[in-house]
Amino acid sequence: GLQTSWFPMRHSENHGRLRRWSYLDKFGCQHGLFSGGQVYLLFLTVYLQEGCKREEMEDAMQIFHYGNLSASTVLIQPVDDHDLEEMETELNEIRKQGKADFQLIAVKVDNWNQDLSPWEASAVFGREGFGDGAGELLQFLLGQCADRRKTYYIGGYSLAGLFSLWAAYQTDIFAGVAAVSPSVWFPGFLQYMKEHDMRAKSVYLSLGNREERTRNPLMATVGDCIREGYNLLKMQKIRTILEWNPGNHFKDAGIRTAKGFAWLIRNQGAE
């Protein structure tokens, strides 16, 4: 089953940096961070009271709930439109490979370079650089992990994979990480891994075997970076694997992500 929540956000004028998170309860009233209910998209057409600004509705973040909402295993995944298009494929593959009940919470991130970046960095391609919104996004995601009786995993593809890795250095709420084709070429991230301890017990890493064959000199370092990152995690006694997939960065994102989450589920509770 799929349930969808709507979480409006307010942005400041500074390059879309999130000033604070807010949402509407079922009657359309605005509240602060994590202080009450949710509104589902099925009911968006009703109960909007005066005082709920249209600009906040236009900036809304969507959260998609898949699978068994009462499952004890919860997968958290920042996604974009392409990830959502491949979600059914991903879910079916997780069910096939993971062989366990789960819920997947997909959080749609509209400003990819801003909200998934742990710190600011110059543009790698095009004109858009990277912001430092990862901290605020993480705080929001932690609000989805309130039931401590459940086991939470975080994962994502590309920059969302990098964010997921970084998030597991900040908190021990996540039992494992699926960093799938992660942007570990990100300036300063490998050094960050060297200087900090991973707080998750399990880390799945993967990369396409043609991803490092790119003309962009920074992105071409992704292979060396993920190999070194994998060795760093092994030195820290983290349960980890580095899997190589056929193809470049844009091949089979949904299936690759599913393989990562399924590996975490299969290894749940392993010593």
Where are these regions (language model features)?
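The feature captures the conserved acid-bearing segment of alpha/beta-hydrolase catalytic domains
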Residues: 184-256, 264
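Active-site signature of alpha/beta-hydrolase-fold catalytic machinery across serine-
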Residues: 166-170
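Gly/Ala-rich beta-loop-alpha elbow adjacent to hydrolase catalytic centers
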Residues: 155-160, 164
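Serine-hydrolase catalytic machinery in alpha/beta-hydrolase-like enzymes
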Residues: 64-147
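A domain-start/cap signature at the N-terminus of enzymes
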Residues: 7, 27-34, 38-74, 102
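A conserved short beta-strand
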Residues: 173-185
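Catalytic active-site module of serine/aspartate enzymes centered on a nucleophile-bearing elbow/loop
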Residues: 257-271
